[in-house]
Amino acid sequence: MAALRLLLGIDYGTKQIGVAVGQAITGQARELCTLKAQNGVPDWDKVQALINEWKPDAIVVGLPLNMDGTPSDMSARAEKFSRKLNGRFGVTVYTHDERLTTFEAKGERMARGGQKGSYRNNPVDAIAAALLLQGWLDEHPELLNV
């Protein structure tokens, strides 16, 4: 397998999908954007535009597990979404445990001086995507071209 240089991270949700980008050379991930979704289905043209712009070597999709590590109700949907990404765009897709990333992202938003209030009005999905992608980068240095 060729070494990975650039990755996209995705925090999958039924109404919003957070996107982050990470680079092997820095070993760092950062938030990129939040896409709207209808019952878990994104605007595939916008996903295509992100892939065309960033040309990722792989995509890491957050896998929502229960706190005991068992699959949650959303796990199957996230895995199906991962397969669709691979099938539509031919890019390698990994999944990564995303437990507590949204909770941590909300804390990070507050630490940055973000507003309290509705999660839908102040989405943290892209921050959560960056956190899960950072976790994947930290756990898989052997796959990175550093």
UniProtKB/Swiss-Prot annotation:
Chief localisation class: cytoplasm
Organism in which the protein naturally occurs: Pseudomonas savastanoi pv. phaseolicola (strain 1448A / Race 6)
An individual GO BP term: rRNA 5'-end processing
Keyword set, alphabetical order: Cytoplasm, Hydrolase, Nuclease, Ribosome biogenesis
Localisation per UniProt entry: Cytoplasm
SUPFAM superfamilies in UniProt: Ribonuclease H-like
Annotated InterPro entries: RNaseH-like_sf, YqgF, YqgF/RNaseH-like_dom, YqgF/RNaseH-like_dom_sf
Family statement drawn from the similarity comment of this UniProt entry: Belongs to the YqgF nuclease family.
A single cellular component GO annotation: cytosol
Keyword Metal-binding carried by entry: no
Gene Ontology MF terms: nuclease activity
UniProt cross-references to Pfam families, sorted A to Z: RuvX (PF03652)
EC number(s) on file: 3.1.-.-
Record's function text: Could be a nuclease involved in processing of the 5'-end of pre-16S rRNA.
Protein name in UniProt: Putative pre-16S rRNA nuclease
